[in-house]
A protein has these predicted regions:
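Active-site beta3 strand of CheY-like receiver
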Residues: 52-58
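Non-catalytic signal-transmission and effector/linker regions of two-component phosphorelay proteins
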Residues: 1-10, 117-133
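Receiver (REC) domain active-site loop signature in two-component systems and cognate sites
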Residues: 63
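Short amphipathic alpha-helix used as the core "switch/output" element in two-component signaling
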Residues: 46, 69-82
Length: 133
């Protein structure tokens, strides 16, 4: 596993929408995050299995193949990112997705149709702060 300083904020962004992925990557990078991106859940899992240990994971739920909740579940089962703040970012606001997210212990859930990158950043910071408290 990679060693990081206590002040480093590392985020893993996983979304199959490359435009949004790039927008969020720019926003978080400007806010001081070390950003890694993956345009598939398989790519995200490969990064984490390869030693990237994020302290925040921001994942889309609905993606081809394995969905974002399955990715979070796999990372947690393998204990690859202990203590990471996990936030689901999706166009879907279905009660089934929210229920699955809650059962997995996801820290936040953002419907992306109603948010812009600065709002997503603010919500991530809010959730990180409340989890540290």
């Amino acid at each position: 596993m990679e060693v990081q300083s206590a002040s480093t904020k590392r985020i893993l962004l996983v979304d199959d929408d490359k435009f949004l992925l790039d927008m969020y990557a720019i926003k978080f990078s400007k806010a001081g995050y070390e950003v890694k991106t993956a345009d598939s859940t398989e790519g995200g899992l490969k990064l984490v299995r390869g030693g990237y240990v994020p302290d925040v994971m921001l994942c889309d739920i609905v993606m081809p193949g394995m969905d974002g909740l399955d990715l979070v579940n796999a990372i947690r089962k393998e204990n690859l990112a202990p203590g990471a703040v996990t936030i689901m970012l999706t166009n879907q606001g279905s009660s089934d997705d929210i229920s699955r997210a809650k059962k997995l212990g996801v820290d936040g859930y953002i419907v992306k149709a109603t948010t812009i990158p600065s709002e997503v950043l603010a919500e991530v910071e809010r959730i990180r702060s409340s989890k540290k408290a």
